[in-house]
Amino acid sequence: MRFADIELVAVGLVGATVYFAMNDWLPVVSLATLYLSVKLTLTNDRVFALPLALAFQWTQTSLGVFYYGITGRTVPAIYGSDYRPMVVLALGCCLALAVGIRVRLMTRAAPDPSVPRPGFAFGYGLLVSCYVGSIFIEGSLLQIAPYYPTFRQIITTLDTARLGVLFLLLRRLCSPKPQWSLIATVVGIEIVLGMTGFFAGFREPIVLAALAVMEVFDRRNRQHWAAVGVATVVAMLLGLIWMGIRGEYRREYTELDQFGQSRSARINRVRDLATGFLNADPEDMWRTADALVERMWAIYYPALALERVPKVLPHTGGAIVSAALTHIVTPRVFFPDKPELPSDSDSVRKYANVHVAGRENNTSIAFGYSIESYIDFGGPMMFLPVFGFGLFVGAAYALFRTAIWHRELFVAFATVAFWLSVYLFERSWATMLGTTMSLMIYLGPPIVVLDRFLLVRFAADRSREKAMLFPAPLNQDRV
């Protein structure tokens, strides 16, 4: 990893500008952390899942700081807690995670680029067919998962494979020259499907499209810059609209049986609610923006807990992390009587002393692995488990990069698996470790097996090509 002089100068100039504009050192530290986290997680193989995931984590640690500094508008974390120490600890966790990933990536060399490896694993027609079929299969898998709790994690992980198929299709549409109209069509379909579910399922299609474009990104191409800008604006606008309509939409989703069973009815309702929101008073939009920042900036409840530990409640000496590790090494397939994980809302109630909605309301309030590490160990020992998790993520990335030989299969697996494993700062240790291990165990090995199967065909094709280029000499009788 090298730091170019122009990069350091640019970071210094941006930091100085931000400091004088906001008159605050915290945004400068935050931007420096973002730069280092992205720089440390670059894998130099044109797969940007890890850097983008760390950037999204950083957003959840610092969004409110910049929102307040730019607009002057406050959210509960600003006026209701001492948020600054928690932001610093959160940034430290992002950096510890990034350092762990970098250290482990450095210990295993990447595959030799001079060694030939197959590019495409599937034909375009098969890919389109798999994508269309995955749209219908996804709903069925999610519906049956609650009825089979023993296999629920396996089912939901296999359902995640649909995102890999989606990414493969988007990646194919980006190469050799991006087909913007088809990319927009596929992403538009996914956004509609995502916004008509109960949760905000429109984020991943936009992220996957951005990652597909980044693989072929050319800094000298204006269309590529325009695509990144459009994706950013669309993501922000969709987030704002969803935050403005989700309360009414979810109420109707749960109370009206016919509404929940009819996708066309949900599409029409989302359209009507979105139209009404966009025509609302500007002050209502600002309040919705405040709510969106509050939702994404996962600092408020951790900051309240930080004030109470260890003054009111003692450190737990590693109990939370130990329970999370125990949970992942006792899969429900082999331990069907394993109790459910406690809701994050229970931790918020206990450590932040705020009675938030919980499992009894079919919801969970995010608490996050960062504050759990602090409650367990305090500072600076809290950064050790984060660093250790980074080591595991880096080791897994390096392992699958050498094990999966088809470029297309590796890029799809790495993009989906490592994005979903790392991108959320608000996850608890149990959820983050469980998600990561499920993806590595239930999704990774099948991809490796598929890769080996397809390599047989690749080897046969190469042998056939060599035979055509260098035919065996004819045996001739000596004279």
What are these regions (language model features)?
Residues H355, R359-V479:
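Hydrophobic alpha-helical segments
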Residues V28-L34, L89-A96, D159-L163, I371, ...:
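Hydrophobic alpha-helical transmembrane segments
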Residues T232-E340:
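Aromatic-rich transmembrane-lumenal/periplasmic boundary elements in polytopic membrane proteins
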Residues V312-F377:
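Long extracytoplasmic/lumenal interhelical loops at the membrane interface
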